[in-house]
Design a protein with these regions (language model features):
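Tubulin/FtsZ superfamily GTPase core signature
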Residues: 1-200
Length: 200
């Protein structure tokens, strides 16, 4: 939602969720409910994974419009991001789409269980993307120790948006040095994992 409000030049947004209420509240006009229930995943990645598998046809339709590159952004550690992002990434890559994951790892105050679940999610999504950027939220707290909880989450959202915008606008905006999609594809294809932990 934050990324959509910030806007990225020439990028189309789709919000996916297992929670129909969260989808209805989203400002993003193109929405995809994963699974039929619409009740959320209850912090259970397995439930979200099943919901995404139920929605493969809808995922294919969403991606089958000439899409050449997809950014899959997700907060790791909860249910939907952790469980569904790897399924969406897998399908995008199967379709020959350059697939970039940008994910966050939770703050320490969110608890060790959530962090462990997030790390499992990062490992799983890394199997299905060409490149994966991992943003360590706790590092933001180390750099900005005076942040309150709300500001810390806002900073994490901003960092995720900046990462996506930076990569997307290399292609979509004209600058002094112009790179096209093939240039970026050459760099990112099967590029592995990068850790983004400094924030700004």
């Amino acid at each position: 939602n934050h990324m959509y409000r910030e806007g990225i030049h020439d990028v189309n947004f789709v919000v996916c969720n297992t929670d129909s209420k969260a989808l209805a509240d989203s400002p993003v006009p193109v929405r995809l409910q994963l699974g039929k229930e619409g009740l959320g995943a209850g912090n259970r990645p397995g439930r979200a994974r099943e919901a995404a598998e139920e929605s493969l046809e809808e995922i294919h339709k969403m991606l089958d419009d000439g899409t050449k590159m997809v950014f899959i952004t997700a907060g790791m550690g909860g249910g939907t991001g952790t469980g569904a992002a790897p399924v969406i990434a897998r399908e995008a890559k199967k379709m020959g789409i350059l697939t970039v994951g940008i994910v966050t790892i939770p703050f320490r105050f969110e608890g060790i269980k959530k962090i462990d679940q997030a790390l499992d999610g990062v490992e799983e999504v890394s199997k299905h993307v060409d490149a994966l950027l991992v943003i360590n939220n706790e590092r933001l707290r180390e750099i900005y120790p005076d942040l309150n909880v709300l500001s810390a989450f806002e900073m994490a959202d901003n960092t995720l948006s900046i990462a996506a915008r930076s990569i997307a606008e290399i292609i979509t905006m004209h600058g002094i040095i112009n790179l096209d999609f093939r240039d970026v594809g050459t760099v990112l294809k099967d590029g592995g994992v990068a850790i983004m932990s400094t924030g700004y």
